[in-house]
């Protein structure tokens, strides 16, 4: 019965007039700036001087009836609903919204510097995003999608060693190994040396499936090849094949205090829980849909009411990163989307053509 009702609502979804769209956009734009419910009187004063207050009030009543705006008990004005924000982001957002010259200059300055890897570049770029949006941002990446560039085995002591994996984005991944009486360190080092020779530029997630071919080569060098591969080597690389590792780092949490929504402790806790929710960042990092620009997801899509995220995926040779701005549903979506789109385009253009990661 509930599904039938939803289907009926979808079928009779009203088609908004141009004036109703303009009223809805004006309400959202005004509420984004002031965080105060918007009245018909205010709209007439600011945007609709050629219309009567009764006309605008009637349009607002229809928008409320259709579910695009709603009344808050603390005021006679109206605020956007999730449905209203969704319609705005799909149909009314200013797609030609430009970023400031200051932002462009600061980003290009970062991209012109010599950093050791892509993560250092994006860390610096995200700090500008934080400052400009006054919101926190999360950078995510999946190590399993990176390529192997080098692998070394370092002996720590008689009982332990460390596998060092250098990836295509110049990150270093480490795995501890216990050395027992059956382990000859030199033989084990031979195993990893052959991997270093044969599997450079292979995705970490695919190495495990290629080890059976490599063991035949190692067998010609050491007698216990099967033992070392089954007990040690496979354990290192099965990790990337069966459990993709997603790393996320949050920047700019301090800016939360600048938003009135988070004076409500429950809403603040909800956002902090979202930032710590590894599940959603894993879904974002492992999302294979790399086409297009920044995507916006509202609270009902991410399981956190009153919150929203805007995500851009940075695609570079052999690696990618996701930058996600997190905040209340009362975000400046046009501005945030423009910033993320510009960041994505410039980083991919400059780093994609000049670096091999």
Swiss-Prot record:
Keywords: Repressor, Stress response, Transcription, Transcription regulation. Transmembrane segments: none annotated. GO terms for biological process: negative regulation of DNA-templated transcription. This is Heat-inducible transcription repressor HrcA. One of its GO terms (molecular function) is DNA binding. Belongs to the HrcA family. It comes from the Bacteria. Pfam families: HrcA (PF01628), HrcA_DNA-bdg (PF03444). PANTHER family: HEAT-INDUCIBLE TRANSCRIPTION REPRESSOR HRCA. Negative regulator of class I heat shock genes (grpE-dnaK-dnaJ and groELS operons). Prevents heat-shock induction of these operons. It comes from Ureaplasma urealyticum serovar 10 (strain ATCC 33699 / Western).
